[in-house]
């Protein structure tokens, strides 16, 4: 059975890159009737926080991503990681390196001066017992390094990139697998080692991650072999790029799923767009889909090698498509909490709020638009420049005045639209203006501007709460 995993580090909130990796893993697992698993890589003791773990889990659930088993907590497996390092030491495949930071800095400076790439020169690979004893007598601690032969031939068939081949000499020298500690101890195990041990223990069959991990894959394959563990199949998805074609980073602004949510993007649109960041839909498939629909079509032969540029216009279009497909009841379920949080009073009868959602729905791109566009229905808006100009135009005040007189004589309750048309026509005629002037002036009086949703429905909603007449009267004061 296919078993894939997402292995986020809880050192921050759920990042868009992690979310895209989660989506690809989940899609592949579902396409193969396999399992999607979670591992929380919390071994960075200083930066890992429980609230970030909670944020990641909640963010994945919001996107519609579920997992088959309880998350594995990496920090609870340190004993197994040290056992693996101990096994490497016993086999002679790892050793203690006593080089201190000053010596390593001098080594790197010399390499830089001679235009050589930075790498550890394996200087302590073959220390004698006497040399080790001498370093220990100096009180030096040691890291533990894994031997990487320069002539090692590392290759694998990547599901996205085809045959990949690396030389051991390109991996920067013998790799540190445990942090510095006294010579009789094993320090904190490091990323490449713990990932191999944990993936094997979780019986992961496929590792799907970003292309920035390709060099790590070469190192990890050597560790799988050294530890006698079966290696998984690898797939390296393209990076997410900004508009300039560079890797998307915090400097580009919004990168956290939290931020996308607060801006008013829906989970369905974000999950949809994450799928399109690097995956091409098959012929005949629409670009708007659910994760479940995408899983039925997902395969790595449609995952691109080139980086995927983040396109705000495409995301906005997808989000609008999602919102426009919702019923008024669905929209109200999401907008009601936003309206209440804003301090607005919603009538107990859902009918009025549902009518408002039906009116606003077709014009929404983001959920937050449902705040901006709903505001004039809950509180009297200020007059904007175009609205003020309209109300100061010839005949506008007379038209509003005649409409007020008509409403005071025959109150419109917001239900009979034929009555509304008659009231507007009569007021325009009495003021000696065209009906278009009457309509523009009414919109300016009610909304404070000349742009907005259907005018009669707008008037109807305000009339049902008796908010129309005070706004009309304001225009004459």
Swiss-Prot record:
The keyword Cytoplasm applies. ATP binds at residue 250. One of its GO terms (molecular function) is glutamate-tRNA ligase activity. Its main location: cytoplasm. It holds the Pfam family Anticodon_2. A motif ('KMSKS' region) lies at residues 247-251. GO terms for cellular component: cytosol. It is found in: Cytoplasm. PANTHER family: GLUTAMATE--TRNA LIGASE (PTHR43311), GLUTAMATE--TRNA LIGASE, MITOCHONDRIAL-RELATED (PTHR43311:SF2). Monomer. Belongs to the class-I aminoacyl-tRNA synthetase family. Glutamate--tRNA ligase type 1 subfamily. This is Glutamate--tRNA ligase. It comes from Synechococcus sp. (strain CC9902).
């Amino acid at each position: 059975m296919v078993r894939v995993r997402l292995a986020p580090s809880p050192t921050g909130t759920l990042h868009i890159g992690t979310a895209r990796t989660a989506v690809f893993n989940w899609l592949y697992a579902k396409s193969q009737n396999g399992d999607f698993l979670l591992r929380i890589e919390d071994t960075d003791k200083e930066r890992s926080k429980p609230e970030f773990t909670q944020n990641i889990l909640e963010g994945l659930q919001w996107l519609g991503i579920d997992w088959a088993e309880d998350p594995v907590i990496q920090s609870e497996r340190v004993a197994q990681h040290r056992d693996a390092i101990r096994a490497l030491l016993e086999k002679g495949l790892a050793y203690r390196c006593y080089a201190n930071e000053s010596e390593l800095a001098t080594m790197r400076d010399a390499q830089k001066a001679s235009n050589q790439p930075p790498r550890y020169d394996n200087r302590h690979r073959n220390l004698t017992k006497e040399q080790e004893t001498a370093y220990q007598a100096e009180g030096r601690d040691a890291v533990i390094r894994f031997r990487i032969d320069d002539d090692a031939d590392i290759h694998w068939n990547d599901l996205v990139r085809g045959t990949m081949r690396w030389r051991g000499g390109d991996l920067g020298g013998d790799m540190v697998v445990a942090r510095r500690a006294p010579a009789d101890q094993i320090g904190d195990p490091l990323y490449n080692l713990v990932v191999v041990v944990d993936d094997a223990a979780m019986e992961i069959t496929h590792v799907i991650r970003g292309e920035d991990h390709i060099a790590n894959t070469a190192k990890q394959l050597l560790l799988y072999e050294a530890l006698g563990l079966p290696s998984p199949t690898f797939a390296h998805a393209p990076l997410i790029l900004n508009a300039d074609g560079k890797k998307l980073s915090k400097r580009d602004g919004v990168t956290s799923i939290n931020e996308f949510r607060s801006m008013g993007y829906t989970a369905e649109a974000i999950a949809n767009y994450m799928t399109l960041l690097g995956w091409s839909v098959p012929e005949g498939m629409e670009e708007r889909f659910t994760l479940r629909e995408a899983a039925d079509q997902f395969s790595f032969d449609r995952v691109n090698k080139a980086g995927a540029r983040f396109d705000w216009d495409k995301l906005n279009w997808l989000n609008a498509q999602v919102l426009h497909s919702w019923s008024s009841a669905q929209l109200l379920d999401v907008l009601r909490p936003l309206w209440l949080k804003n301090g607005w009073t919603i009538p107990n009868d859902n009918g009025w709020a549902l009518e408002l959602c039906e009116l606003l729905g077709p014009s929404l791109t983001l959920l937050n638009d449902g705040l901006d566009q709903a505001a004039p229905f809950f509180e009297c808006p200020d007059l904007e420049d175009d609205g003020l100009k309209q109300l100061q135009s010839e005949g506008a005040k007379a038209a509003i005045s005649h409409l007020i007189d008509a409403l005071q004589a025959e109150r419109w309750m917001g239900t009979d639209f034929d009555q509304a048309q008659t009231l507007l026509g009569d007021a325009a005629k009495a003021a000696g203006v065209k009906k278009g002037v009457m309509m523009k002036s009414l919109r300016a009086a009610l909304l404070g501007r000349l742009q907005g949703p259907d005018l009669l429905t707008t008037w109807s909603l305000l009339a049902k709460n008796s908010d129309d007449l005070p706004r009309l009267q304001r225009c004459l004061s």
